[in-house]
Amino acid sequence: MRKEIRWGDGPDHVADLHLPKEEGPFTNEHGTPAVMLLHGGFWKQAFDRSLMTPIAEALAEAGLIVWNVEYRRWRPDDEGVWQETISDVLRAWGHLEGLDGVDASRTAVIGHSAGGHLALVVAALSERRPKVCVAQAAVSDLVAADAAALSDGGDAVRRWVGSPVEGQATPWNALNPIGMTPQCPVMLAHAEEDEDVPIAMSRACAEAYTARGSTADLVPLPGDHYTIIDPTHEGWRSIQEGVLGWLMSGKSVG
């Protein structure tokens, strides 16, 4: 079952709540585990949460509560919206624990591409830490992504931030996951044939987190940038299995 919920006053302060049809093996006296989903699209207004609907449905069918959220994104006439984006994502994460039936001690965040970047920000900055963070094909190094001109126009990162990295290091460093310390275990899932965001970015991020003492697993998968959000593909099935295993046992993310 899916229903749209407004969690704020703005037009983008909306989310789709997917509920399992019946109580599954993960529900106990404390409630049901829940997952917040963050879509990608290089923080552009042209892309929305419908990108994550297929995996939202798959996770709900498996027995989880799924919170597929929208957030403010940049438009050609309204750039430099990073503060709004980060505020929205952290607020949406805080809203999750108050939803009916959610076991707040077993919540996870999953994001794809630019949403993977945001998921890593949640893992590092949120007051209530996730049980696990799954960053799929994450733009985990903003400086490297800008240098490589990732995205169709090659300038999506600096348009979202609102400035070039040259001479503006402070906001870039403050927003860059590779320099953060996640407060929960992280799965960096990445397709080996990804041409939109190279797997080398997740590999470098996993190494940086591990060097700082965080739990971070790089999970290379078959396929491309989009197969890992396709519930019929083996790449996504591997991710889902890992998430369900973690929420059930807490022993492994990879």
Give residue ranges: language-model regions.
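Conserved alpha/beta-hydrolase "acid-adjacent" motif
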Residues: 195-204
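Glycine-rich nucleophile elbow surrounding the catalytic serine of serine-hydrolase chemistry
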Residues: 111-121
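C-terminal catalytic histidine-bearing segment of alpha/beta-hydrolase fold enzymes
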Residues: 79, 203, 210-254
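Short beta-strand/loop motif that positions the catalytic acidic residue
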Residues: 181, 188-190, 194
